[in-house]
Amino acid sequence: MAAPPQPVTHLIFDMDGLLLDTERLYSVVFQEICNRYDKKYSWDVKSLVMGKKALEAAQIIIDVLQLPMSKEELVEESQTKLKEVFPTAALMPGAEKLIIHLRKHGIPFALATSSGSASFDMKTSRHKEFFSLFSHIVLGDDPEVQHGKPDPDIFLACAKRFSPPPAMEKCLVFEDAPNGVEAALAAGMQVVMVPDGNLSRDLTTKATLVLNSLQDFQPELFGLPSYE
């Protein structure tokens, strides 16, 4: 059972599946590849790789499903297919409302995503204005991010770049993936989890708060200004 919410001053957002509806696109593409080998890219497999860097995720998929290809081949083929669909990614319900609300009230917030720069540019091509509202953005290929989630590197790097940097316990992370929740907790931060409905509920127990949608977030629970 997670501790009750404590007041925070700074917010850090994951991107895939939380702010942008990209996880669905990953599922479609990986299932397409798995079909060739009569394998199923199930939610059990997906929950192992969500939030991980591309090569690491590919190796897990290959090991679990016993696909006869190298991780490099899987990344290359999936990236080619994903390039075609990434620009169609839509914002998740409630994302824009929350970000505009935080901006209006001068609450500092940043983005921490495992996506590398090329992938980030494709995914956000339709939403440049939205992502320009963030104080800074830390990507998965950032030199300070030695280890992907569930290690805390990306959230620690992101918190340090606020000016001035807050205490870690004053940061609230928003995540959709179990690996991301683990990473936030390892960084000493609280975490709001907005899991996909298909994710096993056993994988949501560690979060400070679990929501069905960003639309359900009540900022005042964490000492932030409430919606008007």
Curated annotation (Swiss-Prot):
Name under which the protein is recorded: Pseudouridine-5'-phosphatase
InterPro entries linked to this entry: Gpp1/Gpp2-like (IPR045228), HAD-like_sf (IPR036412), HAD-SF_hydro_IA (IPR006439), HAD_2 (IPR041492), HAD_sf (IPR023214), PGP-like_dom2 (IPR023198)
Family: Belongs to the HAD-like hydrolase superfamily. CbbY/CbbZ/Gph/YieH family.
Coiled coil: none
EC number, UniProt record: 3.1.3.96
Catalytic activity: psi-UMP + H2O = pseudouridine + phosphate
Keyword list, A-Z: Hydrolase, Magnesium, Metal-binding, Nucleotide metabolism
Active site (catalytic residues): D14, D16
Cofactors that this protein relies on: Mg(2+)
Lineage: Eukaryota, Metazoa, Chordata, Craniata, Vertebrata
GO biological process: nucleotide metabolic process
GO molecular function: metal ion binding; phosphatase activity; pseudouridine 5'-phosphatase activity
Gene3D superfamilies to which the protein is assigned, alphabetical: HAD superfamily/HAD-like (3.40.50.1000), Putative phosphatase, domain 2 (1.10.150.240)
Function: Dephosphorylates pseudouridine 5'-phosphate, a potential intermediate in rRNA degradation. Pseudouridine is then excreted intact in urine.
Binding-site residues, Mg(2+): D14, D16
Assigned GO CC terms: cytosol
Induction comment: Inhibited by low concentrations of calcium.
